[in-house]
Amino acid sequence: MALWMHLLTVLALLALWGPNTGQAFVSRHLCGSNLVETLYSVCQDDGFFYIPKDRRELEDPQVEQTELGMGLGAGGLQPLALEMALQKRGIVDQCCTGTCTRHQLQSYCN
């Protein structure tokens, strides 16, 4: 009987010290189908929207020029905004080449 009480106490302490569900997803590499499945899990019913860079360029060849302030408009982006646009990375670069958190994945949800 004392052994069972000791075992239950140890199990309770392990449960308290174990990672909770909010912290279980820290930062990880996600590529290919693992990335897509994780996005489905994170976004759930909201879904997500993603156009690969190659396809986006085929649909609108001026998208990069406009994003970087080289297209038509009122003089393009300011220097700080231009620098941030140059550093902007897609989800594959962010999560497959590097690592991403649950919060970063949620930014790709609709």
From Swiss-Prot:
Stated role: Insulin decreases blood glucose concentration. It increases cell permeability to monosaccharides, amino acids and fatty acids. It accelerates glycolysis, the pentose phosphate cycle, and glycogen synthesis in liver.
Signal peptide residue numbers: 1-24
Molecular function terms, GO-annotated: hormone activity; identical protein binding; insulin receptor binding; insulin-like growth factor receptor binding; protease binding
Pfam families attached to this UniProt entry: Insulin
Localization terms from the record: Secreted
Protein family membership: Belongs to the insulin family.
Keyword Signal recorded: yes
Cellular component aspect of the GO annotation: extracellular space
Record text on subunit structure and interactions: Heterodimer of a B chain and an A chain linked by two disulfide bonds.
Keywords: Carbohydrate metabolism, Cleavage on pair of basic residues, Disulfide bond, Glucose metabolism, Hormone, Secreted, Signal
Record's protein name: Insulin
Propeptide, residue positions: 57-87
InterPro entries recorded: Insulin, Insulin-like, Insulin-like_sf, Insulin_CS, Insulin_family
SUPFAM superfamilies: Insulin-like
Higher taxonomy: Eukaryota, Metazoa, Chordata, Craniata, Vertebrata
Top-rank taxon: Eukaryota
Cysteines engaged in disulfide bonds, as pairs: C31-C96, C43-C109, C95-C100
GO terms under biological process: acute-phase response; alpha-beta T cell activation; fatty acid homeostasis; G protein-coupled receptor signaling pathway; glucose homeostasis; glucose metabolic process; insulin receptor signaling pathway; negative regulation of acute inflammatory response
